[in-house]
């Protein structure tokens, strides 16, 4: 390809809406253009890199026996209603109606569709296991699309689904996917970790995330020197709970005008934040639930949804709270509330004489105690675990680092096959629901994650395995230099090198800056040293080699550098 013909409009300044390096660099380097919030067009350079990422993923899927298919983006609502996720999935699901007023969704994932697909095709244990996968666009109506392609509303994903007649068979395939995903990351060249994770809206028995480390990653990874690593959505709290060893005092309702937040209440009443209990109201498929957590701890919403088994759970709106309870948000509490399930974090078991909302505007209760003043229906671990708190494996202090989730694998079990009544005949002639697994990989997220992890002040640093072009030939001389550059370009092409020649009529400075910005792994400069029979090879990370201006010598050096 000739740079003079390449559609790669580079920018000299960062876009105004760019929040993180990858979002800025992919636009500046001419890889993507924003069409709407969370919606991007991938330009030729990005498409080349995406295809290379896809090919690595495809090779690893084929290696473990997965078979590629392609399913429709649009899915009928009946499948999702049947599985129970039409309402559970939440507002991220993009719903629409056709001209006949039938409900559809733009698929955020394909568990329902693939389960229905095999319903009348896989009917005997002799046909199992089977693993199917696709690489296709997905749609999720993110409440706040941000960070460019890392959290987009339309994105490219590889999703795979396996069907089994035993848990042992699922375990075997699950292990193969763990190994395949690790190979994908190693082939691309990213620093990563594998963590225990929450199953979220997908559901299932067990799940793991594959996370690339990045300063601006959305995932907070807690890890330990012993080898343990987990998402902060999943890590259990293993610290000690503070025991309030004191006598119970008489409960009082005190006036707290315009005091709503934990910090304001603590300051107004002159108490420590740890003596306050936060009362949070959520609404799910079974109605309202009140959740209690210590004032000095943060609620882990993913733990709460997993514990209640309700992915539709949402924080109740202030106007609904006022209408249904007659109390403004900020003054809710467990004392005197009725017809609401109360779930509390385990840390509250050991508290005495604490502060809660007074169920009356501008009032709080002090000296509240369990059993005497209210009852908790269920106890659970509901708080966010912080760095420095004990590792659940060895007890040593946890450390933290941010990362970007690229892959997520799940042991679904019979979650979908049972609800959708999809069965096979086992060895004993009995009809049984399939045991399933699902395995996602963010293709377009990988594009952003690579840039997020591998860049410098000058631009992107593409690994050779996924660079849009491995080599750029930069001509900065006159006719003799141009003639040799053309000859070298054709020679390298014939030898299978993925090469671009920068034949534009622009200054050498512009060519060098664009080469660094775009991030080609290797630049061959044919310039002033050519008169002495030399050319310059410069790696993107800085190593410079002056070699003989001979095609075979150059090819040998190029191949050696690209294989390192």
Curated annotation (Swiss-Prot):
Pfam families: HGTP_anticodon (PF03129), tRNA-synt_2b (PF00587), tRNA_edit (PF04073). One of its GO terms (molecular function) is proline-tRNA ligase activity. It is found in: Cytoplasm. Signal peptide: none annotated. Consists of three domains: the N-terminal catalytic domain, the editing domain and the C-terminal anticodon-binding domain. PANTHER family: MITOCHONDRIAL RIBOSOME PROTEIN L39/PROLYL-TRNA LIGASE FAMILY MEMBER (PTHR42753), PROLINE--TRNA LIGASE (PTHR42753:SF2). This is Proline--tRNA ligase. The lineage of its organism: Bacteria, Thermotogati, Thermotogota, Thermotogae, Thermotogales.
């Amino acid at each position: 390809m000739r740079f003079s013909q390449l559609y790669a409009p580079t920018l000299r300044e960062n876009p105004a809406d760019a929040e993180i390096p990858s979002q800025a660099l992919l636009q500046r380097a001419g890889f993507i253009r924003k069409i709407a919030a969370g919606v991007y067009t991938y330009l030729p350079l990005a498409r080349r890199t995406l295809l290379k990422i896809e090919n690595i993923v495809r090779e690893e899927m084929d290696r473990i026996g997965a078979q590629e298919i392609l399913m429709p983006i649009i899915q009928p609502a009946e499948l999702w209603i049947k599985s129970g996720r039409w309402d559970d999935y939440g507002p991220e699901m993009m719903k629409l109606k056709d001209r006949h007023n039938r409900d559809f969704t733009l698929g955020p994932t394909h568990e329902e569709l693939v389960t229905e697909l095999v319903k009348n095709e896989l009917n005997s244990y002799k046909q199992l296991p089977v693993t199917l996968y696709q690489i296709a666009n997905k749609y999720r109506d993110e409440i706040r699309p941000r960070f460019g392609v890392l959290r987009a509303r339309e994105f490219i994903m590889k999703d795979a689904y396996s069907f089994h007649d035993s848990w042992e068979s699922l375990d075997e395939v699950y292990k193969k996917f763990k190994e395949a995903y690790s190979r994908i990351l190693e082939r691309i060249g990213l620093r990563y970790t594998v963590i225990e994770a929450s199953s979220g809206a997908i559901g299932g028995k067990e799940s793991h995330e594959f996370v690339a480390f990045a300063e601006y990653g959305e995932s907070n990874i807690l890890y330990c020197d012993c080898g343990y690593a987990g998402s902060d959505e999943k890590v259990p709290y293993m610290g000690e709970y503070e025991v309030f060893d004191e006598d119970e005092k008489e409960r009082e309702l005190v006036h707290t005008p315009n005091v709503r937040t934990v910090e304001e209440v603590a300051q107004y009443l002159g108490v420590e934040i740890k003596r306050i209990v936060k009362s949070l109201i959520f609404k799910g498929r079974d109605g309202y639930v009140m959740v209690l957590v210590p004032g000095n701890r943060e609620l882990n919403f993913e733990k709460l949804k997993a514990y209640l088994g309700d992915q539709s759970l949402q924080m109740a709106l202030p106007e609904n709270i006022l209408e249904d309870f007659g109390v403004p948000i900020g003054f809710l509490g467990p004392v005197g509330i009725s017809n609401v399930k109360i779930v509390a974090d385990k840390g509250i078991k050991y508290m005495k004489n604490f502060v809660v909302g007074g169920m009356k505007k501008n009032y709080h209760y002090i000296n509240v105690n369990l059993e005497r003043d209210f009852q908790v229906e269920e106890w659970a671990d509901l708080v966010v675990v912080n760095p420095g708190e004990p590792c659940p494996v060895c007890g040593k202090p946890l450390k933290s680092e941010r990362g970007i989730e690229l892959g997520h694998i799940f042991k679904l079990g019979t979650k979908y096959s049972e609800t959708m009544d999809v069965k096979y005949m086992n060895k004993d002639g009995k009809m049984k629901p399939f045991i399933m697994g699902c395995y996602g990989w963010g293709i377009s997220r990988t594009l952003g994650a690579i840039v997020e992890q591998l860049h410098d002040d000058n631009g992107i640093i593409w690994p050779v395995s996924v660079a849009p072009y491995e080599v750029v030939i930069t001509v900065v001389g006159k006719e003799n230099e141009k003639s040799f550059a053309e000859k070298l370009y054709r020679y390298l092409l014939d030898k299978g090198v993925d090469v671009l020649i920068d034949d534009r009529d622009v200054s050498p400075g512009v060519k060098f800056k664009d080469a660094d910005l775009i991030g080609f792994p290797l630049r061959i400069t044919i310039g002033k040293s050519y008169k002495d029979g030399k050319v310059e090879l410069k790696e993107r990370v800085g190593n410079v080699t002056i070699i003989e201006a001979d095609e075979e010598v150059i090819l040998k050096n190029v191949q050696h550098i690209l294989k390192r």
